[in-house]
């Protein structure tokens, strides 16, 4: 009789240990560790299960990576376009805020307020671009070292900034960034139209900001303004004029 009780206790202990191990495994999987169980059904992406048999794939199941023409190489195009745009937007965030603080001259208050608007708009789109990059399965790199090394944009001068200097600087800077983003739209529009649409929105706002700076100096038939009034009687040079 004692042997029977002992056997029951041992068996019960083994069963309890197995259950606890199973629970720990389930908890580990729930904490973000990928499951290696090949029988786990693939997420429902609206495509046949034959296209989603690799449960160990590092790519997420979303529109950017399950399009018929897409895959690892096309994902790289989207990530590169988004990361480069993010880096440039972050550089512009820093530069617009630097100019917002330090602009001087006749138009200092107008530019002070305008640059704050630009800073807020650029910050909003920087966040959208970073989150889109996460949506397609890559991390976003917003570190200061990355901004300095990879933005490939001229640095804004330190110290006080003359209003004419600020206008010229951002007219060129926005033009450069807008042209780069326009190129990226073409690079990704077929394989990742959602990313392309977002980049078009960014391009639109950057072109708007470029116009708002350029308009301070732009000639019209009735006003041949070239910046004399804010540049000590000398024209402010702009390309194409």
From Swiss-Prot:
InterPro entries: DPS_DNA-bd, Ferritin-like, Ferritin-like_SF, Ferritin_DPS_dom. SUPFAM superfamilies: Ferritin-like. Pfam families: Ferritin (PF00210). It comes from the Bacteria. Gene3D superfamilies: 1.20.1260.10. It catalyses: 2 Fe(2+) + H2O2 + 2 H(+) = 2 Fe(3+) + 2 H2O. Fe cation 2 binds at residue 131. GO terms for cellular component: cytoplasm. GO terms for molecular function: ferric iron binding; oxidoreductase activity. Fe cation 1 binds at residues 100, 127, 131. The keyword Transcription does not apply. The keyword Nucleus does not apply. Keywords: Cytoplasm, Iron, Iron storage, Metal-binding, Oxidoreductase, Plasmid. It is found in: Cytoplasm. Transmembrane segments: none annotated. Residues 25-65, 220-241 are annotated as: Disordered. Its EC number is 1.16.-.-. It is an enzyme of class 1 (oxidoreductase). Residues 33-57, 220-229 have a biased composition (Polar residues). One of its GO terms (biological process) is intracellular iron ion homeostasis. Belongs to the Dps family. Protects DNA from oxidative damage by sequestering intracellular Fe(2+) ion and storing it in the form of Fe(3+) oxyhydroxide mineral. One hydrogen peroxide oxidizes two Fe(2+) ions, which prevents hydroxyl radical production by the Fenton reaction. Homododecamer. The 12 subunits form a hollow sphere into which the mineral iron core of up to 500 Fe(3+) can be deposited. This is DNA protection during starvation protein 2. It comes from Deinococcus radiodurans (strain ATCC 13939 / DSM 20539 / JCM 16871 / CCUG 27074 / LMG 4051 / NBRC 15346 / NCIMB 9279 / VKM B-1422 / R1).
């Amino acid at each position: 009789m004692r042997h029977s009780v002992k056997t029951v206790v041992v068996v019960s202990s083994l069963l309890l240990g197995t259950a606890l191990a199973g629970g720990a495994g389930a908890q580990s999987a729930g904490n973000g560790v990928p499951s290696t169980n090949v029988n786990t059904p693939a997420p429902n992406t609206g495509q046949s299960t034959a296209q989603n048999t690799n449960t160990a794939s590092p790519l997420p199941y979303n529109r950017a990576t399950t399009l018929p023409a897409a895959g690892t190489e096309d994902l790289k195009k989207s990530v590169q376009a988004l990361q480069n745009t993010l880096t440039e937007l972050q550089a512009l965030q820093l530069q617009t805020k630097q100019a917002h603080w330090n602009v001087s001259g006749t138009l200092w208050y107008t530019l002070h307020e305008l640059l704050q608007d630009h800073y807020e708009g650029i910050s909003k789109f920087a966040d959208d671009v970073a989150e889109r990059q996460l949506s397609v399965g890559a991390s976003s790199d917003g570190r200061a070292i990355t901004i300095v090394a990879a933005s490939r944009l001229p640095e804004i001068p330190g110290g006080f900034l003359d209003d004419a200097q600020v206008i010229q600087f951002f007219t060129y800077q926005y033009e450069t960034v807008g042209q780069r983003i326009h190129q990226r739209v073409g690079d990704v529009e077929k394989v990742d139209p959602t990313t392309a649409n977002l980049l078009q929105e960014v391009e639109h706002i950057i072109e708007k900001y470029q116009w708002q700076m350029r308009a301070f100096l732009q000639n019209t038939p009735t006003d041949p303004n070239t910046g004399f009034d804010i540049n000590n009687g000398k024209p402010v040079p702009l390309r194409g004029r």
